[in-house]
Amino acid sequence: MTVTQQAFKQSLAQFASGVTVVTTMHAGHRQGLTVSAFNSVSLSPPLVSICVDCKLDVHAAICASGVFAVNLLAQQQLEYGMRFAGMVAGLTDRFEGVDTLTAITGSPLLPNTLAWLDCRVWQVYAGGDHSIIVGEVLATECGAGLAPLIYHNRNWGRIAAIDAGNAAPPGSPGASTEN
C-alpha cells in the first residue's frame, strides 16, 4: 500500500503539538523558522531534536553555524508563530520590530517565551526531505509559567484544562465510550 502525501499530512495534522521558533545567527544574519517537530532526546547529556526542511536557508545557516536556539511559544505569542512560519504578508525580515536577546551561542532569543534552549549542533541525520538536527543544550531558561501555544489540525490553539480527578480509567464503569 502506498501512502499519499495528502493522507500522510492529514494524519499528522491530528497530532497536537507545542509551537517553537528555532533561531540561529550565521555570517551576521539572523534566521528563524516556526517548528513543531521538536523533541527531547536525552537528559545526559541534555539533547533535543528539531526537523528542518533541507531546502530552507535556515537549514543551511544552522548547519554552517553549528548553533541554534529553540524558543517555546506561549499562547499570547501567536504572532511570532505566524511571523516565523512566513504567514505575515509583506514581511521580508521575520525579526523586524522584534527586540531579541542574544544567547551564549549568538542565536537570537525571543522575549517572554515559555522557555528557551540554546544549543550546539550535536549531530545531523538525513530524514528524507528534512534533516533531523540533534542539539546539545548549553543553556536554558524558563519564563513566567504561561500557557503554551498549540498547533492542531492546521489551526492554532491553546490548552483547555480537564479535571482529571473525575476521570474514570478506560473500561471501568462510568468511562466514556466516545471515539
Where are the model-predicted features located?
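Basic, polyanion-binding surface patches
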Residues: 1-179
